Every structure is written in structure tokens, then in C-alpha cells.
Regions:
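N-terminal amphipathic alpha-helix/helix-capping segment at the start of soluble metabolic enzymes
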Residues: 1-20
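Catalytic alpha/beta core domains of metabolic enzymes, predominantly
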Residues: 12, 116-250, 254, 259-265
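Hydrophobic faces of well-ordered beta-strands that scaffold small-molecule active sites
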Residues: 17-23, 45-49, 83-85, 104-106, ...
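Active-site mouth loops of central-metabolism enzymes
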Residues: 17-34, 58-60, 82-86, 107-108, ...
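Long, contiguous binding/interaction regions
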Residues: 36, 40, 45, 67-82
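Glycine-rich, proline-tolerant flexible connector loops at the mouths of alpha/beta enzymes
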Residues: 48-67, 230-239, 295-304
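Catalytic beta/alpha-barrel core
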Residues: 64, 80-89, 93, 102-116, ...
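Domain-level signature for soluble enzymes in the chorismate/prephenate branch of the shikimate pathway
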Residues: 260-354
Length: 354
């Protein structure tokens, strides 16, 4: 599928990444201006701050609303930076534009709601402003693309996707699981769409920001949106995932930006080997499916059920152990054989039901 897109034309040093930075929330005028001034001194061109804050539970700081918008306008006037904030309703859009907000982004909870997205799209019709769309809280690429389609069909051509990770009940390392395969697939399907990484919300802890920034660059992301606060330990929201402008500047200075396009004869030879191995894999899978169909015919003739749970568990256990010996994760092997088993069952059901 395709979106009708135009270049973002954002101020940058014409190098990856372009960086959007600022506090999670616009708490006070002093906090906003102090943070913005420090970021501008470090060379940041785009300032971010949450004016309206959707919180998981009531009672937390939900933003200062319209009261904070003049502070954002002041940042723009005094530092020359562009300013950006999150919008979730048509009223937010109207107020943000009234105060000269340069870039709007749409949060994960809003992206997950097609009704809310359509209302925002309708409010943006006829307006030329960059709009960035965060992934929905659940790992649903079609929902993410659908949200961007609604905005694009309203006439917004300057767009980007923000990858902020996906919610999970079991939070071990990350606040939101990165599930990199989803933005990678988004890039494959819409290669001209810029993708921005939000390491603050993926990690949930400031010590994870640096490695997540580097991983995003290694995967070819165009930009970073990072929460930075003049005094992060005293932040009114998400204190643990914010860093000072000095720390952010240090993190950015350590990034290794690799060439996206250059290829050499050596890598072409290796890629040819990959192609040949992929062909071998396809041949082996086809051969395995032929044997599965023969088993399906046997089950039909002997009135056996397709699903043999003990056999399936045996396969997963043995192949997981084999994969570990070969340097592959058990989860990866399980995913592969779950897919193979699903296709085997489908083909056997076709035979039994003929």
C-alpha cells in the first residue's frame, strides 16, 4: 500500500538522526524554558512537551492544557526551535494551531481508536502541518497503518511514524516491548515513510535510552524523540525515563551512524549465499509438507484426529534443544515450528474433510 507523502523539511544537520527532545510534560513555564534553552544550546532543533497527558489511571498529572501553550510559543520565539506536542481531540488540534505549534503527534492510545483517529483527521482537513503517528498500544500493524491512512486521506502529506513499543502484561526489561519486526515490516511496506524511535517509552528507564537509540540507528530509523528534562528526578510524570540535556547530548555523541546504501562485492557474495540457502529451505519445507499430507491421508483412513498434542510437544521440545545447541533462541525456534505446525494442520484438515 502507499501513502501520498511529501518530505518533512525539518531543520537538521542533514544527517541521521533528526532529534526531537524535551520533557514528558510542560509542568511550569520555568521548567519549559530552562529545558528548552539547554537543549537549544546543545544544537537541538525541535522541542517537545506534553500539554495534554492521557494517563492510565485518574489522579495523576494530566497536563496543564491550554495554559502551557503560551510557554511553547515562547520557546519558539526565544530559541528558534520548532515546537511539538501531542493532540488527542479536535479541540487539542484547534488550540495547538492557534498557538503556533509546528508539529503534532498522535499518541498510542488514540491511534488504537479508529473513531478518535477519524475525528482528528476531519479536524486536520485543509491544514498543512506535519503529523507523527505513534504505534497503537497493541502490536497491530494494520491498525497503525490504518490510522496513518486516515490522516493522509485528510490531506496531510508530511507524516512520520513513531515507534514507542507495545504494551505487555509481563514487564521485565522494557516498559513497552520494542518488537522491532513491526516497524521493520512497516518500512518494507511504506519505505518512503520516515520512522522515529521513542527510546524513552520503550525503555521506561534512562539507562536503556542509549542502547535503544543505537539499535534504532542500526535499523535505519530516521529520527529519535527523547524525553529530556532540566531536573528529571523531580519530573511530575515519567521521571525514570527522562535525561538531562547534557546526558542526551552525550548519548547522541556516542551514536554510530552506519551507511544505509553502500554495498561491496564481499557482502553481495554473502547475500547470494543467503539466497541459495533460502531456496534450500523452501525445498525442504515443501518436502516436509508432502510428508505431512501423507500423514493426513493415513489419519483419514484410520479415523484419527489431526491434532496429536503429545507429538507436537515432542517436536517443540526437541527442536528447541537443537536450536539452543546451534546458537538460536528457544523462542525463535518455537515461533518457526508453531508456524510450520499450523500449516501442516491446515493441509491435513483439507485432506480429512475432502
Amino acid at each position: 500500500m502507499e501513502l501520498e507523502l511529501q518530505p518533512l523539511n525539518l531543520p537538521s544537520d542533514n544527517e541521521r538522526p533528526f532529534v526531537i527532545a524535551g520533557p514528558c510534560s510542560a509542568e511550569t513555564e520555568e521548567q519549559v524554558m530552562t529545558t528548552a534553552t539547554q537543549l537549544a544550546q546543545k544544537g537541538c532543533h525541535i522541542f517537545r512537551a506534553g500539554v495534554w497527558k492521557p494517563r492510565t489511571k485518574p489522579g495523576g498529572f494530566e497536563g496543564n492544557g491550554e495554559m502551557a501553550l503560551p510557554w511553547m510559543k515562547c520557546v519558539k520565539e526565544e530559541t528558534g526551535m520548532l515546537v511539538s506536542t501531542e493532540v488527542a481531540t479536535p479541540e487539542h488540534v484547534e488550540l495547538a494551531l492557534k498557538y503556533g505549534i509546528d508539529i503534532l503527534w498522535i499518541g498510542a492510545r488514540t491511534t488504537a481508536n479508529p473513531f478518535a483517529m477519524q475525528a482528528l483527521a476531519d479536524s486536520l482537513r485543509g491544514i498543512d502541518v506535519p503529523v507523527f503517528v505513534k504505534n497503537p498500544v497493541n502490536p497491530d500493524l494494520e491498525l497503525w497503518i490504518g490510522a496513518m491512512e486516515r490522516i493522509n486521506q485528510a490531506g496531510i502529506k508530511r507524516m512520520a511514524a513513531i515507534h514507542r513499543g507495545f504494551s505487555s502484561y509481563d514487564k521485565k526489561i522494557y516498559r513497552n516491548l520494542p518488537m522491532w519486526q513491526i516497524p521493520i515490516e512497516l518500512h518494507r511496506r511504506i519505505p518512503e515513510l520516515p520512522i522515529i524511535c521513542d527510546p524513552s517509552h520503550i525503555g521506561g528507564r534512562r539507562e536503556l535510552i542509549a542502547p535503544l537509540c543505537q539499535q534504532a540507528m542500526d535499523l535505519g530509523f530516521e529520527g529519535l524523540i527523547v524525553e529530556s528534562h532540566c531536573n528529571p528526578d523531580c519530573a511530575w510524570s515519567d521521571a525514570k525515563q527522562q535525561v538531562t540535556p547534557d546526558v542526551l547530548d552525550y548519548i547522541l555523541s556516542l551514536l554510530v551512524i552506519r551507511d544505509e546504501t553502500s554495498t561491496t562485492e564481499d557482502i553481495q557474495i554473502l547475500r547470494k549465499q543467503i539466497d541459495e540457502l533460502d531456496n534450500d529451505l523452501m525445498s525442504l519445507l515443501a518436502k516436509r509438507m508432502r510428508v505431512c499430507r501423507e500423514i493426513g491421508q493415513y489419519k483419514k483412513e484410520h479415523n484419527m484426529t489431526v491434532l496429536q498434542a503429545n507429538r507436537y510437544n515432542e517436536i517443540l521440545e526437541k527442536r528447541g534443544a537443537q536450536g539452543a545447541l546451534c546458537g538460536m533462541s528457544a523462542d525463535f525456534i518455537a515461533q518457526i515450528f508453531e508456524g510450520i505446525h499450523e500449516e501442516s494442520v491446515r493441509q491435513q484438515l483439507e485432506i480429512i474433510n475432502k
